[in-house]
A protein has these predicted regions:
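Short, hydrophobic alpha-helical segments
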Residues: 37, 163-175
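Serine-dependent carboxylesterase/thioesterase catalytic core
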Residues: 2, 9, 13-17, 26-116, ...
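Catalytic histidine neighborhood in serine/cysteine hydrolases
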Residues: 138-153
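Post-His helix in hydrolase/transferase enzymes
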Residues: 30, 155-168
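Alpha/beta-hydrolase-fold serine-hydrolase catalytic core, especially in secreted/extracellular enzymes
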Residues: 173-196
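Acidic catalytic loop of the alpha/beta-hydrolase fold
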Residues: 122-128, 151
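Catalytic histidine-centered segment of alpha/beta-hydrolase-like enzymes
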Residues: 26, 149-158
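Short alpha-helix in the alpha/beta-hydrolase fold that links the catalytic acid
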Residues: 3, 129-136
Length: 196
């Protein structure tokens, strides 16, 4: 079971990010994700769910297209703090992506996106520093601790159940009613084994 299946089983209309294997930020990443959002957007704002680097992309996308984004949920994403020290895989990322982690190939927005944001983080992550995934109070609307390792956030059933439930609770809190799940799409950008 993975995060997309867990969301679909809970009634969400789920759409993968459609960019294949995530090899880091590229000059056209946000443009391609913007097009993907346009394909999914049908007049109802879209919930963006992103794991690890995918969560950082989701936040950037929300900065650029807030009128199309319902909320952003990040799963163990290192969006806060010093990008040089907030993850144990910085050197690997830089080799794979071909650029310094602090110099992505597109301008990076600062601060919290202008939409509701929910951050999932774990003390046991092992890849991303807990404080980097939790964020500061001015960077996120709600931060929820999950008891899992980094990959467990998108694969481990107890974590998946908790994440789906917390997303629904969060949306109920900000919208004043339980989410009409079928009325919203979800883009999940994460490391995929094959192109969609």
């Amino acid at each position: 079971m993975d995060i997309r299946r867990a969301l679909a089983r809970a009634g969400w209309r789920v759409h993968p990010w459609g960019l294949g294997l995530n090899r880091g930020a590229k000059p056209d990443t946000l443009e391609l994700l913007g097009r993907r959002l346009d394909e999914i957007y049908d007049g109802r704002r879209v919930l963006l769910v992103g794991w690890s680097l995918g969560g950082m992309f989701a936040r950037e996308l929300a900065h650029r297209h807030p009128q199309k984004v319902r909320a952003v949920a990040t799963l163990c994403s290192p969006f806060s703090g010093d990008y040089k020290t907030n993850t144990n895989v910085r050197e690997l990322y830089e080799r794979v992506a071909g650029h310094d982690v602090n110099e992505p190939p597109f301008p990076r927005a600062s601060g919290k996106p202008p939409v509701p944001t929910l951050a999932f983080w774990s003390r046991r992550d092992g890849i991303v520093a807990p404080s980097a995934a939790r964020g500061r109070g001015d960077e996120v609307d709600c931060a929820v601790e999950i008891d899992t390792y980094h990959v467990g956030a998108v694969l481990w059933r107890p974590a998946l159940s908790r994440i789906v439930g917390e997303i629904e609770t969060f949306l109920t809190g900000i919208e004043g009613r339980p989410p009409v799940r079928k009325a919203c799409g979800v883009v999940v950008g994460h490391f995929e084994n094959k192109p969609d």
